[in-house]
Design a protein with these regions (language model features):
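Metal-dependent nuclease catalytic regions and adjoining charged, substrate-binding loops involved
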Residues: 168, 172-281
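A residue-level signal for conserved active-site and pocket-lining positions in enzyme catalytic cores
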Residues: 21, 138, 252
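Glycine- and acidic
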Residues: 3-7, 150-155, 236-238
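Mg2+/Mn2+-dependent nuclease catalytic core
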Residues: 113-210
């Protein structure tokens, strides 16, 4: 549910900076579409506004955690008491300014590509009966192909599934009326911030990759349905599948109410006992 999701959505200050940074890039791109360019001063003002807004929204969520007694643990896990606004602003501006200098954005500024648009992932698309929130950040028509761009604010190490996950953007956009229905008419471009620079990865779409991507999506949905079935009607977390590594739990907002939050090994043992108890009662 939305309420459950908002309770989980507690982030470190660094993650809030990244979220605000991407939000600012979107707003600047939308203005660019209307031939409005930002000054450096205005860009800094917008990133401050967005960061303050996201931090204020998080404080409201933390006030709920304070009522249920989990706020102190969350603040300790995410180091929320250590705040340096100017350091965050400096890093955000570095990312935005360097993004604006990339060949890709410069081509948009100089009107080399006439047809392009910005999307937000709040809009869902449908693929094989599954609602997907995986739109590209930007779609640009270059000659006979649509280039689907994903902006990764803090690029992680390459995953063996990264290409197939990116192909979900093709599934999403093929469900829209104004776009071609042939997978080979798309090119995926991932612009990821890695080691202090914007790196670009290009992936050519194909029917085979799209089929594999859809299979991966269906598999992920199946796993999520298993998680929901474990919650039961009372939405109890007592039998919810736990993480494999304790490092995964470190920044989880629900750590204090999770059966494996304080000790993953102990949590797994307790769940095994509960599952055996349920099995013997059937």
């Amino acid at each position: 549910t939305k309420k459950w999701h908002s309770m989980c959505d507690v982030r470190s200050h660094w993650d809030l900076m990244l979220r605000s940074c991407k939000q600012t890039i979107f707003e600047r791109l939308e203005d660019l579409q209307m031939n409005v360019e930002w000054s450096q001063l205005f860009t800094e003002r917008k990133i401050r506004e967005n960061l303050n807004e996201n931090m204020f929204r998080q404080q409201k969520i933390l006030s709920i955690h304070e009522i249920v007694g989990t706020k102190n643990a969350i603040e300790r896990n995410l180091e929320l008491n250590n705040l340096d606004i100017e350091y965050l602003i400096k890093n955000a501006l570095k990312r935005i300014n360097d993004f604006w200098k990339t060949d890709f954005v410069q081509a948009l500024i100089n009107r080399f590509h006439k047809q392009w648009m910005v999307f937000e992932r709040k809009e869902y698309g449908s693929a094989n009966g599954i609602d997907l929130y995986c739109s590209p950040d930007i779609a640009v028509k270059i000659q006979n192909h649509w280039h689907l761009v994903r902006i990764d604010m803090q690029g992680k190490k390459d995953s063996c599934f990264e290409e197939l996950e990116a192909m979900a953007m093709v599934s999403w956009i093929m469900g829209k009326n104004m776009f071609p229905r042939l997978p080979d008419r798309y090119v995926i471009r991932i612009m990821a911030w890695r080691n202090g620079f914007w790196n670009q990865q290009r992936i050519n779409s194909s029917e085979q990759k799209l089929t594999q991507s859809n299979y991966l999506i269906e598999s992920d949905v199946g796993q999520m349905q298993i998680v929901l079935s474990k919650l039961g009607k009372d939405k109890s977390m007592s039998l919810i599948p736990l993480a494999r590594k304790s490092s995964t739990c470190r920044k989880c907002a629900l750590r204090e109410s999770c059966p494996g939050g304080s000790n993953l090994i102990s949590g797994n043992i307790q769940q095994t006992i509960l599952e055996l108890a349920e099995y013997t009662q059937e």
